[in-house]
C-alpha cells in the first residue's frame, strides 16, 4: 500500500477573470520511505501541488489518500490533527517566530504537543547542530542570515519526526556547501527514521540526488 496516493486531482485559480488550470488530473503514488524531488518551471504549480499534498489547500476535484484514509473526507479539525501529527513543512519563507531563539523555535512544536521539555530541547539542539547551527542556538531570527533561518525552519520541520516531509526550495538561499549538508541530512533522517520526503527544487544537484525525480509541466506530473 502506498503511503500517499493522489487520484485525478484538479486545481484551478482565477486571475483577472481568467481561469488558470494548475493541476490537471494528477495521479501519483508515493511509497513509504521514498525520497522524491519535484522540478518544473517557475509558475508551473509546484508549490500548489505541495500544498494539496500537505492538506493546506483542497483540490477542486480528486482525492488525496494517506495509507487507506481519504484525507479531505475528514472534517477541518481532523485534517489539522492529521497534518500536525504526520507532516513536516519547510516553506520558501521560514515563518520563524521573531521573539524566540533558534532553539526555542525548533523545540516549540514538540512543546506544544506536550512532549518532555528536556528531551524536546535536547533533540532540537541536536538538529540545529546537524544543520550546522550549533553555534547559533541562542540567536533570534533577526540575527540570522536568510540561509541560516531556512536551516532553522528545516530543523523545526523534523523535530516531531514526521512520517512525511514536504519542502519547498529548502536550499534556495544556501551556498553549495551548505546545501550539500542539507542533502546529507535528508538522506540521514530517511535512513534513520524512514521519513518520506517530497522536495520542490530548482537545484539540479539536489534533484538528481533523489532516487525518484518528478516533473510538473502543463498541469501534469511525470517521471523526470
From Swiss-Prot:
GO biological process, one term: lipoprotein localization to outer membrane
Membrane topology, record value: Peripheral membrane protein
Main location: membrane
A single GO cellular-component term on record: plasma membrane
Pfam family membership, one: ABC_tran
Domain ABC transporter: 4-224
Subcellular location: Cell inner membrane
Enzyme Commission code(s) on record: 7.6.2.-
Keyword line: ATP-binding, Cell inner membrane, Cell membrane, Membrane, Nucleotide-binding, Translocase, Transport
Subunit structure: The complex is composed of two ATP-binding proteins (LolD) and two transmembrane proteins (LolC and LolE).
Family: Belongs to the ABC transporter superfamily. Lipoprotein translocase (TC 3.A.1.125) family.
UniProt function note: Part of the ABC transporter complex LolCDE involved in the translocation of mature outer membrane-directed lipoproteins, from the inner membrane to the periplasmic chaperone, LolA. Responsible for the formation of the LolA-lipoprotein complex in an ATP-dependent manner.
Protein's name in the database: Lipoprotein-releasing system ATP-binding protein LolD
Species of provenance: Myxococcus xanthus (strain DK1622)
